[in-house]
Amino acid sequence: MLTAHKIKIIQSLDKKKYRQKYNLFLVESNKIIKEIEKSNYKIQEIFTNDLTLFNYKGVEVSAVSDVELKKISFLQHPKDSVALCEIKNSEIIDTDIQIVLDGIQDPGNLGTIIRLADWFGIKQIICSDDTVDVYNPKVIQATMGSFLRVNVVYTNIHDYLDTYPHAII
């Protein structure tokens, strides 16, 4: 159920501080929400204007009006559903090909890079600590679901590259 308190929490998730505090982020659009079920992300709750779309075991699905959806959406023209998801702990995986990013500040650019990495089959992106947060709503939207398939890890990239065992191009 969508309470005033929950609306306030969801609206606060546009800021990294609150995403970290609540360990939650927002995903918008039915297509991406349906993909989450096949990933290692956990959906806490789905808010939708069509209850017939989602029947996930252990996930609360709440009906909302278009007015309520507009309140909790970060989009100017909200889609039909919003999912509240838990942030997962990302750990570095051993993979030959990966992208290392330093200081990317534009959420749309990071989202596009993640989407391209997914398209090329790159499973991991290492980001410097000052790179925009992968769970920023604009990044999530720009990835078009690719954040589900690409592991994004934040670390000190100088230390990481000093100990990286594979060839660096």
Predicted segments with their positions:
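S-adenosyl-L-methionine/SAH cofactor-binding core of RNA-modifying enzymes
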Residues: D50-D94, P137-I169
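Short active-site oxyanion
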Residues: K21-L24, K42-E45, V59, K123-I125, ...
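Boundary-proximal intrinsically disordered activation/regulatory segments immediately upstream
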Residues: M1-D50, T131-V132
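RNA substrate-binding interface of SAM-dependent RNA methyltransferases
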Residues: K38, D94-I169
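General beta-strand structural signal in soluble alpha/beta enzymes
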Residues: L26, A63-V64, C127
